[in-house]
Amino acid sequence: MDPYKHRPSSAFNAPYWTTNSGAPVWNNDSSLTVGARGPILLEDYHCEKLANFDRERIPERVVHARGASAKGFFEVTHDITHLTCADFLRAPGVQTPVIVRFSTVIHERGSPETLRDPRGFAVKFYTREGNWDLVGNNFPVFFIRDGIKFPDMVHALKPNPRTHIQDNWRILDFFSHHPESLHMFSFLFDDVGIPADYRHMDGSGVHTYTLVSRAGTVTYVKFHWRPTCGVRSLMDDEAVRCGANHSHATKDLTDAIAAGNFPEWTLYIQTMDPEMEDRLDDLDPLDVTKTWPEDTFPLQPVGRLVLNRNIDNFFAENEQLAFCPGLIVPGIYYSDDKLLQTRIFSYSDTQRHRLGPNYLLLPANAPKCAHHNNHYDGSMNFMHRHEEVDYFPSRYDAVRNAPRYPIPTAHIAGRREKTVISKENNFKQPGERYRAMDPARQERFITRWVDALSDPRLTHEIRTIWLSNWSQADRSLGQKLASRLSAKPSM
């Protein structure tokens, strides 16, 4: 027991074996029985040992179950105080401790790290004004734009509930109803669809967020991570060979940090004045299935992320590590992106299910700054408290509201309605991305799609929809796919 932190710690281990309650165990090799051959007694430590073992595992994440974490710091390199009042971005040279979790998305905790699958890239900043979670992926876009479809999307991507095998026909059936997914698939089926490891991988906040300055000026922002060592991906045959070690990316990250070869990323932002939104003919800046063109909205450097420490315990700092896009700090705010709004609720909700209502008290998730509220008790609450006043306000407790900080104050009015955005434009950016590939890369992209569309359970109707969608993105792409599939593209 650490007497200063009021919680168990292996740094204060007893020199001999004990029970969970601290009683000495004089024999941890044999069960207590009635005679040498008799039955085991319920009073034996054996029962506590088994009961604890039976409860070691917790529910795995419904997505991003397979992951690896590391610790380090974020250092500001460029002044953006004209855009945000965020304290941890207050000046170049300021460093903030972080923990980062990389992950695959769809498959289980023990699945290979060589699957064609998006990768999670989540960063927790332990700032002086609370924790900020930037919870993103390696691709800058997503499959869907409305969070109400998220459970259906995950079900379609997950293994078949009857056979527990991931089926292309299920995936292509679902996304045939969602042509906005084409842009994401232009990344996933491209050469970048299987990152070589976590160190050579881009990251993106994916959503549009909001920066708020000290004066209250609001700016739309997108966040991007770029590895200083460059991006590397696995070709399909390389992934098969690499799959002999199903934890290759975790091992690469751990070994690199242990050897002092610290991974590093540069944080860039793209910014947009919200008043410019109405002047964009074919782009909704809150559409998570689109990127902002860099020639119009250039990348601006902000700082660097360095991972220089491996985690001390996988369960405590990876499995119990919890991220939520709803965790923000003054100077950074949400946008009205429908998928982001969904994630703000869903992520904290799933952590309470997975880890319990007091998951933010766990060391990896707790803020490193002083904090104070009246959120009391609940399952597994181990915070040491001795206050007599558990309400607010009170003349017996001097605690007060924090100093006011600016938040967006846009006026919003409208009718209750369920609708899609007006600027869908689902085909332009996927087509541009395909045409930017060199011929050999295009050929590999086509080969992967022919393989997916050749699933014997895929109906002619669904295959025709996909040929039509890709033809609308790029006519020659649709024709090549149709030719390989001995079908005619439908326009």
UniProtKB/Swiss-Prot annotation:
GO biological process: hydrogen peroxide catabolic process; response to auxin; response to hydrogen peroxide; response to light stimulus; response to reactive oxygen species; response to xenobiotic stimulus
UniProt EC number: 1.11.1.6
An annotated Gene Ontology molecular function: metal ion binding
Stretches assigned to coiled coil: none
Keywords: Cytoplasm, Heme, Hydrogen peroxide, Iron, Metal-binding, Oxidoreductase, Peroxidase, Peroxisome
Entry's localization field: Cytoplasm, Cytosol; Peroxisome matrix
GO cellular component, one term: plasma membrane
Primary enzyme class: oxidoreductase
Keyword Phosphoprotein appears in the UniProt entry: no
PROSITE patterns assigned to the protein according to its UniProt record, in alphabetical order: CATALASE_1, CATALASE_2, CATALASE_3
Reactions that this protein is recorded to catalyse: 2 H2O2 = O2 + 2 H2O
Active site: 64, 137
PANTHER family on file: CATALASE, CATALASE-2
Family statement: Belongs to the catalase family.
Task of the protein: Catalyzes the degradation of hydrogen peroxide (H(2)O(2)) generated by peroxisomal oxidases to water and oxygen, thereby protecting cells from the toxic effects of hydrogen peroxide.
Subunit structure: Homotetramer.
Entry protein name: Catalase isozyme 2
Gene: CAT2
